[in-house]
Curated annotation (Swiss-Prot):
Gene for this chain: tgfb1i1
Residue ranges of domain LIM zinc-binding in the record: 271-330, 331-388, 389-448, 449-506
Biological processes per GO annotation: cell differentiation; Wnt signaling pathway
SMART domains xrefs: LIM (SM00132)
Name the UniProt record assigns to this protein: Transforming growth factor beta-1-induced transcript 1 protein
Residues covered by region (Disordered): 15-62, 154-201, 221-244
Length: 506
């Protein structure tokens, strides 16, 4: 037994201290583990440099990798010396096997880096750079929109300590934003060939009612600060308030765009303003085939902003409704005011519909039409009553179709026989004493009707008893014989032959 203990002691002394430690899960006899120094603190810069390196590989030190292997408790050692030597050999074999198994297991968990994996990581880094570039582009759009609003300010207080060029990332803060310039921001990665260029600066534009502040974080040796705030807020005295020239803003914008292009960030303009002929960033108005800044799309006469209201075009220039109607709209001949909506054109003039009225009755003339006399408009009733012809039959005004006869004008329905009111079918009529008559009543008025048949007598006639008869219609009332020969007798205004009269009244 003492020999076994001595061999075990020699084994522990000869075993290298950097070999992996075998731990057991047995709670009865926990084995002491070797105390190692804590891992070094995490450094983001070191991690970033290791991450961006495409050719470096992580060194794998097998001696510093540890694993936990479940070790079952060994059986008790036989007191015999021969059995102790066998047990010692078994322990040595098991130790060597366990050491190789642990090493293989750890190496399988940490495979070596091949070039394909390194290439994939490089692509991920490029995508991150693109994302940062897109975020910088969004910030550029926000800054350019704020610069458009900045043009509308009349004056600002300006304090310049040293000249500097504006480059890098920008941010526009609206009222109510509480961002800090010291907070980390995502910016586009600078290529290696531009590392010697001046370090970009970031600045912040804060727009609020009565408060305009432009701050620049000093990264290089230059600093530009322009503010219009009280001295108690800004912490520095402003010598005097001066207006910012338009060229300063334009040059600042040009320098900003050139700096972004040098970093590989493309800036796209939305066109040139038709009024100022400068690039448009942010909101844009498209009208009349051109693009405009919203603050430059104004009325050509009164110079007020048109915005989303209606406008009119004249010779390629926009006008608001009020000025367009006052300048170019036709005017009413009565009230001499511009005609905005419906219009009546008559007698060489333009009129409001409610102002185009009859000269006599003052009623508006509608779709029924009007009549003109000496340059004045009249409704139909007043015109024909004053100046129109009168029907000879009904003494009413003749407005539409008429018949001219007997020296006058007649309504078609009024030109009929004066006695029986029968229309003249064939267009022929007879006139007696200035009146139109049919043939029957004409002969009746003249006494040329046959007393026997009551038809007009156009040929020979026989006069008897104060009446006229056709020769064949003068007959005896009793025997109906013709009385064209000889004499006849009369009784109660009826003719009789001699025989019938003697027989009846003799």
């Amino acid at each position: 037994m003492e020999d076994l203990d001595a061999l075990l002691a020699d084994l522990q002394i000869t075993t290298p201290p950097r070999c992996p430690v075998l731990l057991t899960d047995s709670p009865e006899k926990p084995q002491p583990t070797e105390t190692r120094p804590p891992p070094p603190p995490y450094d983001p810069k070191t991690a970033m440099s290791n991450k961006t390196s495409d050719h470096e590989t992580f060194p794998v030190d097998k001696d510093h990798l540890y694993s936990t292997v479940q070790k079952y408790p060994l059986p008790s050692v036989s007191p015999a010396l021969g059995g102790g030597l066998c047990e010692l050999d078994r322990l040595l074999n098991e130790l060597n096997a366990t050491q190789f198994n642990i090493t293989d297991e750890i190496m399988s968990q940490f495979p070596t880096r091949d070039p394909s994996e390194q290439k994939a990581e490089a692509q991920k880094e490029a995508e991150k750079r693109a994302l940062s570039a897109s975020s910088a582009t969004l910030e550029l759009d926000r800054l350019m929109a704020s610069l458009s609003d900045f043009h509308k300010q009349n004056t600002v207080s300006q304090e310049v300590e040293a000249p500097g060029a504006y480059k890098g990332s920008e941010e526009v803060s609206r009222p109510g934003d509480t961002e800090d310039l010291s907070s980390p921001r995502s910016t586009a990665c600078v290529p290696k060939d531009l590392e010697d260029a001046p370090t970009p600066k970031s600045f912040k534009v804060v727009s609020a009612p009565g408060h305009l502040e432009v701050k620049t974080n000093q990264v290089n040796s230059d600093e530009v600060t322009a503010s219009r705030v009280p001295d108690s807020v800004s912490g520095s005295k402003v010598p005097e308030a001066t207006s910012v020239p338009r060229s300063d803003l334009d040059s600042m914008l040009v320098k900003l765009q050139s700096g972004l292009k040098q970093q590989g960030i493309e800036t796209y303009s939305k066109g040139l303003c038709e009024s100022c002929q400068r690039p448009i960033a942010g909101q844009v108005v498209t009208a009349l085939g051109h693009t405009w800044h919203p603050e430059h799309f104004v009325c050509a006469h009164c110079h007020t902003l048109i915005g989303t209201s209606n406008f009119f075009e004249k010779d390629g220039r926009p006008y608001c409704e009020k000025d367009y109607f006052m300048l170019y709209a036709p005017r009413c001949a009565l009230c001499e005011l511009p005609i905005v909506q419906n219009m009546v054109t008559a007698l060489g003039c333009t009129w409001h519909p409610e102002h185009f009225c009859c000269k006599v009755c003052k009623k508006p003339i509608g779709e029924e039409g009007f009549h003109e006399k000496d340059g004045e408009q009249y409704c139909s009733d007043d015109y024909f009553r004053l100046f129109g012809a009168v029907c000879a039959g009904c003494t009413e005004a003749v407005k539409e179709s008429y018949i001219s006869a007997l020296g006058g004008l007649w309504h078609p329905q009024c030109f009929v026989c004066h006695v029986c009111h029968t229309p003249f079918i064939n267009g022929s009529f007879f006139e007696h004493e200035g009146l139109p008559l049919c043939e029957t009543h004409y002969h009746s008025r003249r006494g040329s009707l046959c007393a026997g048949c009551e038809q007009p007598i156009t040929g020979r006639c026989v006069t008897a008893m104060g009446k006229k008869f056709h020769p064949q219609h003068l007959n005896c009332t009793f025997c109906l014989r013709q009385l064209n020969k000889g004499t006849f007798r009369e009784h109660d205004e009826k003719p009789y032959c001699q025989a019938c009269y003697a027989r009846l009244y003799g």
